[in-house]
Regions:
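An acidic, glycine-rich, mixed-charge low-complexity segment common to nucleic-acid enzymes
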Residues: 1-124
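Conserved binding-pocket/active-site segment within a compact domain
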Residues: 91-172
Length: 172
C-alpha cells in the first residue's frame, strides 16, 4: 500500500483477517498453543482512531466503509502524528500472521514492565532506529487472543526480554 488509504486498509483487513482465527504454536510448554481471533473492529484501536475521532469502533469502521472517514478527515488533528506510524505500519500484521517473517514473540510471563495495556503477547521488529510493536490481549472469557495495539517506539526494552519461538500452524 504505497498511498495510505483507510478504506484500502479496511478492505485488506476484512479480506485477509476479519472473522478468522489462527492457531499459534510456541516452544513454551505452559502456553504451547493459543488462538488469535481477528475482528474488523480491532482496526479502530490498532490504527489509533480513538485518539483523533470521538466515534466508537463500530461507527468509525462503518464511516470508513462508506468513505465518510478518510485520512483527510483528521490530518490536521493535533494527535495525527501519533497515529500516522500506526497506519504506515499496518502491513506488519501481515508480516506476523501471513508472511511468517517474524519468528519470535514475547509472552506475558517475560514482559518485565507491565503497562496499562496488559498485553499477553508482543510481536516486534527493529526498523532502523525504532521498533514496530504489535500487541495482543487475552480474552479470559473465550481464552482467545485479540489484536490490541500497533505502534512504534524508540525504547529498546523488547531487545532485553526473553523471546519465545512461534509458528502459525493453521487458519480456522
Amino acid at each position: 500500500m504505497d498511498e495510505l488509504c483507510l478504506k484500502e486498509i479496511f478492505e485488506d483487513f476484512n479480506e485477509k483477517f476479519s472473522g478468522k482465527k489462527c492457531r499459534v504454536e510456541t516452544n513454551y510448554s505452559k502456553l504451547n498453543n493459543f488462538i488469535v481471533s481477528f475482528d474488523v473492529l480491532d482496526l479502530h484501536h490498532l490504527l489509533g482512531l480513538h485518539k483523533v475521532i470521538p466515534l466508537k469502533a463500530t461507527d468509525s469502521i462503518e464511516s470508513i466503509k462508506q468513505e465518510r472517514l478518510t485520512l483527510e478527515s483528521f490530518k490536521n488533528h493535533s494527535q495525527y502524528s501519533d497515529i500516522k506510524p500506526r497506519i504506515e505500519n499496518y502491513e506488519f500484521i501481515e508480516e506476523v500472521f501471513k508472511a511468517s517473517s517474524i519468528e519470535v514473540c514475547i509472552l506475558e510471563k517475560d514482559i518485565k514492565q507491565k503497562s496499562s495495556m496488559n498485553l499477553a503477547v508482543v510481536f516486534f521488529k527493529k526498523d532502523r532506529n525504532k521498533y514496530i510493536v504489535l500487541g495482543l490481549k487475552r480474552n479470559i472469557r473465550t481464552n482467545t487472543f485479540h489484536l490490541a495495539t500497533l505502534h512504534e517506539t524508540r525504547s529498546k526494552q523488547y531487545e532485553s526480554y526473553k523471546k519465545t519461538k512461534f509458528e502459525i500452524t493453521e487458519w480456522i
